[in-house]
């Protein structure tokens, strides 16, 4: 949850050995977060590339390893970087996601312009490198993985 105007650098963040049950969307990286006072402004929400300046957040490297998410509802993952400052690298290894039989509808991220959904797979946008290794998504409706504006996508 690092939107424009929140000048921060996130790098070498590792999440591992985690078990989740009955969560809406277990993996969310959202550069269009709307819960701050300026969250619904055009500056924060536009999907057009803006000039990079001191207010532009930077997310460099994130790793998710050995994680099981059971009985999920909305989406397996929703990863959305800025067009002007893509997320550097997201690596997901040994991930297993299943869905609740009666999955609730909901928003995959706190971001303007999204509709409610359920049983969605992984959605990734504006990332330099996305690595999915031994990632199992079971029970989704539609594609397990949808990528847009990814420079280097590796699936093993």
Task: List each model region and its residues.
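Extracellular/periplasmic carbohydrate-active domains that bind, remodel
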Residues: 1-156
């Amino acid at each position: 949850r690092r939107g424009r105007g929140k000048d921060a650098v996130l790098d070498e963040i590792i999440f591992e050995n985690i078990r989740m049950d009955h969560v809406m969307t277990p993996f969310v990286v959202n550069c269009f977060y709307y819960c701050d006072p300026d969250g619904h402004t055009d500056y924060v929400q536009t999907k057009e590339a803006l000039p990079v300046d001191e207010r532009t957040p930077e997310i460099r490297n994130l790793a998710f390893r050995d994680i099981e998410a059971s009985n999920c509802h909305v989406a397996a993952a929703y990863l959305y970087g800025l067009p002007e400052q893509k997320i550097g690298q997201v690596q997901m290894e040994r991930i297993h996601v299943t869905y609740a039989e009666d999955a609730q509808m909901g928003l995959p991220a706190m971001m303007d312009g999204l509709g409610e959904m359920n049983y969605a797979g992984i959605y990734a946008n504006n990332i330099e490198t996305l690595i999915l290794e031994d990632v199992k998504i079971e029970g989704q409706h539609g594609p397990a993985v949808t990528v847009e504006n990814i420079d280097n996508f590796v699936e093993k």
